[in-house]
Amino acid sequence: MSELRFVRLGFGEQAVEYTEAWQKQREVHADRFEDRVPDTCLLLEHPPVYTAGRRTAESERPLDGTPVVDVDRGGKITWHGPGQLVGYPIQKLPRPVDVVAHVRRLEEALIRTAADFGVETSRIEGRSGVWVLGDPVERRQALGGLSLDFDPRLQDEEFDPRLNGPEYAPSNAGQRREDRKLAAIGIRVAKGVTMHGFALNVNPDNTWFDRIVPCGIRDAGVTSLSAELGREVTVEEVLPVAERHLRDILENAELAPRAVEQPKAAAPAPAPA
């Protein structure tokens, strides 16, 4: 991959309104498609805002009527705001684009970032993002032959079967206490170039998530680096660490197009008798 350029758009009092950053994404996306700029990662904070991906249901929006910006990324509703490091990597990928591989690269960079601050995180089968796994619990006894545990894959509309493999923790079917999401990822690819990206919770006010069903996932919580460590961590501290891991992962990735299964050749017609 080409050298990755970082652009710090604004943090703290200079946080960037979501619609302004979205327009900036579109401009950089067009420039990247035409090869006028290299692969670029926009880094910033937003003022408080809810954004809804294409598959957000009405029941998942804020119950109090708080305004929501509808966007063209995948996934469902989430919140952005102070204390959250947001990154929009705008990269040209080989076609057909392997979106899952791109998501995994972003997850790996954020997993390494969290590890540098002493927070152990993981992927979870079927779910994008970076997670702190819930503590193990003893297997609960069946009641009258009916197990009290459940398989979330049967009820989770967000479960993505492509997100699996040895690097993923198994779905939480009661064997752990509530898993907690540290970083959300939502991607769009247009003309072979990525948009949108990740949001890493550093030290936000997590009560903003109480008004919605974050990412459409009802059986998990939300956390932050500060909450997990029990001390204040700032976006300013995390920014250079995240940049280092994003550069290392994204610049050194061996990009390959998505494997496409070839149609099987038709069996030859039987010879006439």
From Swiss-Prot:
One of its GO terms (cellular component) is cytoplasm. Pathway: Protein modification; protein lipoylation via endogenous pathway; protein N(6)-(lipoyl)lysine from octanoyl-[acyl-carrier-protein]: step 1/2. Gene3D superfamilies: Bira Bifunctional Protein, Domain 2. Keywords: Acyltransferase, Cytoplasm, Transferase. The keyword Acyltransferase applies. It catalyses: octanoyl-[ACP] + L-lysyl-[protein] = N(6)-octanoyl-L-lysyl-[protein] + holo-[ACP] + H(+). Residues 35-254 form the BPL/LPL catalytic domain. Its main location: cytoplasm. Pfam families: LplA-B_cat. The keyword Transferase applies. Substrate binds at R73, G74, G75, K76, I77, T78, W79, H80, A184, I185, G186, G197, F198, A199. One of its GO terms (biological process) is protein modification process. The record marks K181 as: Lowers pKa of active site Cys. It is found in: Cytoplasm. Its EC number is 2.3.1.181. Catalyzes the transfer of endogenously produced octanoic acid from octanoyl-acyl-carrier-protein onto the lipoyl domains of lipoate-dependent enzymes. Lipoyl-ACP can also act as a substrate although octanoyl-ACP is likely to be the physiological substrate. Belongs to the LipB family. In the reaction, the free carboxyl group of octanoic acid is attached via an amide linkage to the epsilon-amino group of a specific lysine residue of lipoyl domains of lipoate-dependent enzymes. NCBIfam families: PRK14345.1. This is Octanoyltransferase. It comes from Streptomyces griseus subsp. griseus (strain JCM 4626 / CBS 651.72 / NBRC 13350 / KCC S-0626 / ISP 5235).
